């Protein structure tokens, strides 16, 4: 896969999510906190991203996860 600007939407999602965009180094480049369920708003990466990770809304704040951190998987 390649890095490119990406976006996410919540139109069919019934619960709030934290949306994390990661670059190819798995660095968090953008977090959208508690994205609203069923929203048709686009949530952009803002920069080229290779991955997106979804967690329950509030997870990032509750676990002190922020932009600039690295993820392993």
Where are the predicted features?
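Compact, glycine-rich, soluble single-domain proteins
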Residues: 1-73
């Amino acid at each position: 896969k390649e890095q490119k600007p990406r976006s996410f939407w919540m139109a069919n999602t019934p619960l709030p999510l934290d949306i994390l965009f990661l670059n190819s180094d798995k660095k968090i480049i953008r977090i959208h906190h508690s994205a609203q369920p069923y929203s048709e708003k686009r949530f952009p990466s803002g920069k080229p991203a290779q991955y997106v990770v979804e967690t329950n809304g509030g997870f990032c704040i509750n676990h002190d996860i922020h932009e600039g951190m690295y993820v392993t998987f």
